[in-house]
């Protein structure tokens, strides 16, 4: 297992780049030790990845968007680890992802039940694409594996409900850096 407690703590920020989170909220949600969580958040703040604001008794942490290059690279590293972990648990989806990447121009991520880890045997595979793709070739791959692939294709990044849903729970499969930069630049 590549992911560790520190990765779990930081994952909360990956679904909402403008979110504010307390250590106690993250610890409770992830079922982690409060002190461990607090120490790691403080460490990320010292490294310039997070900032904090105290409101009452609560210390709210958020991404340090004034330090975009460091934050982007840290997010990218964590996202790559999450993708590896996902592929270790979902070998068939890894194969499908490898095959469909050839037919995607731009960026792509998995969202929906597979990204949340709630998929069932008959779940479809939701793919969010910014750019373009060869839908006919992807449909052939879908038929080959007998898994319905549901494509959501945007020619360019745009803020809407679907984008927000895809960002909230996702696994990057192609050009993660491009989407991360779009999100960071739009403060989304």
Each model region followed by its residue ranges:
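Catalytic core of pol beta-like nucleotidyltransferases
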Residues: 1-103, 115-121, 131-188
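Short coil/turn segments at beta-strand junctions that form active-site/ligand-binding loops
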Residues: 106
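Glycine-rich beta-strand-to-loop/alpha-helix junction loops that act as flexible
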Residues: 111-113
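Short active-site oxyanion
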Residues: 124-127
